[in-house]
Structure formats: C-alpha cells, structure tokens
C-alpha cells in the first residue's frame, strides 16, 4: 500500500488528507523500509508539500505523541523550525521566559540543535534546567510556574522510525516543519519562525487546521526563523480562523536596524551567557531582537493590544528582573521535581 503513495508523489501528484494520514501512520508504526521512506521524503520535497499533506502528517504525529493534559487550554509555544543555518542564539527560548513572567502559560516544545551549535534543549540544559521530565512533572510545571519544556525526543517516540533516513538524506524534509506543529500539549497560541518564506502562509493555514486560535508565522529578514532586526519580516497572522499577510520592520516599532551578525550565537555555553546577560540588563541588538519577538508573542497571546505596547511590556519584564526570576524558578522547580521522582 505504501508503494502506491510513493508512486503518486514520485509522479508529482498530491496526496489527499486521508492518503497522507495513512502513509504517515505506516511510517510512525515502522511499517515502511528505510529505502521506501527516503524515496517518499525526497519526492515530497521535490514536488513541494501541500497544506493537506502537512496537516495530515501533524495530526498523526500528535496522535502518536505522549499527551500532556492541563485544564487551561490557553497554552502557548514559541518553537520554530530551525534549519535556517544562520547560527543565531536561542532567541525563542529567551522569549519563552519573558512570556511566562508576563503571565502567558508557555509549553516550550524543542529539541537538540538543528542549524546552530545549540538547540533549545542544549541551552536550557546549560542553564541548569532539567529537560527530561515525565509528563506528570511537565504538567506540574505548566500549572505551578507557567512554563515547561517538552523535549521532543521524549514525547515523540514514534519518530524514531524516520530518524535514520532523515540523517542519511541530510536535506530538509517534511519533518523539519512538523516539530513546531506537533506540540503534545493543547496549544492555542503560537509564535513560529520558519526557514522558508514560501511556507509562511501555508503553515498559518496548517495551524488553523490544527485548532490554533492565534498565531504569527514569521520568516525573518536575511532568512532567519525569528523576527529579525535587519529589515522586513514576512508574517502570516492567524486570528480566529482568518489569516492576514503582514510585513513588519524593526523601524516601524521604534527599534534600531542591525545586521544578522549582531545576533550570532555559539555553543550552548555561549548562548547561556547571552541570555543571562540580556536578563541582567545588557542593552544592544541581542536584547532588542528578544524584545521584538516577545512583543509578537505577547500580542498573539492577547496580553497587549499592539506590537508597540508589547515592546514596552517586554522591556518592563526584563528591567524589573522578572525574566531572570522566572528562569531561576524553572531551574529550581525542574530539579526539585527530578529529585522528587528519584526518591519516591
């Protein structure tokens, strides 16, 4: 049966929602050989994945994931695709702490490095946070401190069947966009950066199909998967089923323009220092890019009425020490939960 789907995409034909769901089920259940899967992923990539194909794949991946249940359905994620090969520091990870300090409940979905030397999991670990907590502890983090890290490899065990072909292929595949679309918690708000400008609007459509209420999907100037300070950012804003195309520049919001070189990161240890410096009051482009992305997150989460208001609020959270306090709280609480699990 899988060969039928393979032959269709090789011919450049699109799969229906049902067909893609069935194909993805077979992949996630390990019923497809590495050769078949490699051919399928390459053919999909060559023809271009459709909204239906991405939606179907994300639905299956979410169904196969270890679920997280929390009474509040107003959770937010700041997970981007990575894969932009620009080597920026962990901007969306820094943003998550500021959002949580502002009262947004953040279920930060993430993994080890994709395009940089440090993924969100790497830098959080470097900051002293316990990143491998069981679902019950993750739920406690969300309820008690407004922020939790959902380590993708712990929650998406079924993706192991695709790991070898993906690594051997070494190219972008549908799995590169699926990570941010498959948060195991019930996400209603999302700030999602993406490496490909052509995918900005389609991914907003996918998020709508998956039940997200409000989201911003952004492809930053100079190709980063975040809002950039270097020029116009291409944005799709999803608001209760309606999608609006926007272009947002830092100058429009009273921020200075900086090149991408000014927001470069490095190893997990270097990125840890950058985040701590920002939270300790260091000014400059690294702080500004975090503030800009946080403003977008606050706007998406209905905490402010405009991006300008979001910028002021984000700066207040940093300057008051609340962002640093939230980070310290997460370090303390995740390690307490880990110790509790070992002694019980």
Swiss-Prot record:
EC number(s) reported in the record: 2.4.2.18
GO cellular component: cytosol
Amino acids binding 5-phospho-alpha-D-ribose 1-diphosphate: 80, 83-84, 88, 90-93, 108-116, 120
Pfam families, per database record: Glycos_trans_3N, Glycos_transf_3
GO BP field: L-tryptophan biosynthetic process
Catalytic activity from the UniProt record: N-(5-phospho-beta-D-ribosyl)anthranilate + diphosphate = 5-phospho-alpha-D-ribose 1-diphosphate + anthranilate
InterPro entries found in the cross-reference section: Anthranilate_Pribosyl_Tfrase, Glycosyl_Trfase_fam3, Glycosyl_Trfase_fam3_N_dom, Glycosyl_Trfase_fam3_N_dom_sf, Nuc_phospho_transferase
SUPFAM superfamilies on file: Nucleoside phosphorylase/phosphoribosyltransferase catalytic domain, Nucleoside phosphorylase/phosphoribosyltransferase N-terminal domain
Annotated Mg(2+) 1 binding sites: 92, 226
Pathway stated in the Swiss-Prot or TrEMBL entry: Amino-acid biosynthesis; L-tryptophan biosynthesis; L-tryptophan from chorismate: step 2/5
Cofactor, how bound (note): Binds 2 magnesium ions per monomer.
Positions contributing to anthranilate 1 binding: 80, 111
Annotated keywords: Amino-acid biosynthesis, Aromatic amino acid biosynthesis, Glycosyltransferase, Magnesium, Metal-binding, Transferase, Tryptophan biosynthesis
GO MF entries: anthranilate phosphoribosyltransferase activity; magnesium ion binding
Binding site for Mg(2+) 2: 225-226
Required cofactor(s): Mg(2+)
Top EC category: transferase
Binding site for anthranilate 2: 166
HAMAP family in the record: TrpD
Record function comment: Catalyzes the transfer of the phosphoribosyl group of 5-phosphorylribose-1-pyrophosphate (PRPP) to anthranilate to yield N-(5'-phosphoribosyl)-anthranilate (PRA).
Record text on subunit structure and interactions: Homodimer.
Family of the protein in this entry: Belongs to the anthranilate phosphoribosyltransferase family.
Name of the featured protein: Anthranilate phosphoribosyltransferase
Annotated source species: Petrotoga mobilis (strain DSM 10674 / SJ95)
């Amino acid at each position: 049966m899988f060969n039928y789907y393979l032959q269709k995409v090789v011919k450049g034909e699109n799969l229906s929602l049902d067909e893609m769901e069935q194909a993805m089920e077979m992949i996630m259940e390990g019923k497809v050989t590495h050769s078949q899967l490699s051919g399928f992923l390459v053919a999909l990539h060559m023809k271009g994945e459709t909204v239906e194909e991405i939606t179907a794949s994300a639905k299956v991946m979410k169904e196969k994931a270890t679920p997280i249940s929390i009474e509040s359905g107003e959770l937010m994620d700041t997970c981007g695709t990575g894969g932009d090969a620009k080597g920026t520091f962990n901007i969306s990870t820094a943003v998550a702490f500021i959002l949580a300090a502002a009262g947004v409940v953040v279920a930060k979905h993430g993994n080890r490095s994709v395009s940089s030397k440090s993924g969100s999991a790497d830098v959080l670990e470097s900051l002293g946070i316990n990143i491998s907590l069981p679902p019950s502890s993750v739920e406690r983090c969300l309820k008690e401190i407004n922020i939790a890290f959902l380590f993708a490899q712990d929650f998406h065990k079924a993706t192991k069947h695709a790991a070898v072909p993906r690594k051997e292929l070494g190219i972008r595949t549908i799995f590169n966009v699926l990570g941010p679309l498959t948060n195991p918690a019930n996400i209603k708000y999302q700030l999602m950066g993406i490496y490909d400008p052509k995918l900005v609007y389609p991914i907003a459509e996918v998020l709508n199909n998956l039940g997200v209420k409000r989201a911003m999907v952004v492809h930053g100037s100079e190709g980063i998967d975040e809002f950039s300070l270097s020029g116009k950012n291409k944005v799709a804003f999803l608001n209760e089923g309606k999608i609006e195309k926007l272009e947002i520049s830092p100058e429009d919001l009273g921020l200075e323009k900086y090149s991408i070189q000014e927001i470069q990161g490095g190893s997990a240890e270097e990125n840890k220092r950058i985040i701590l410096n920002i939270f300790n009051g260091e000014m400059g482009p690294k702080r500004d890019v975090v503030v800009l992305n946080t403003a977008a997150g606050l706007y998406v989460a209905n905490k402010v009425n405009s991006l300008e208001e979001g910028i002021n609020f984000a700066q207040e959270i940093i300057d008051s020490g609340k962002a640093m306090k939230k980070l310290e709280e997460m370090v303390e609480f995740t390690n307490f939960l880990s110790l509790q699990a070992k002694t019980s």
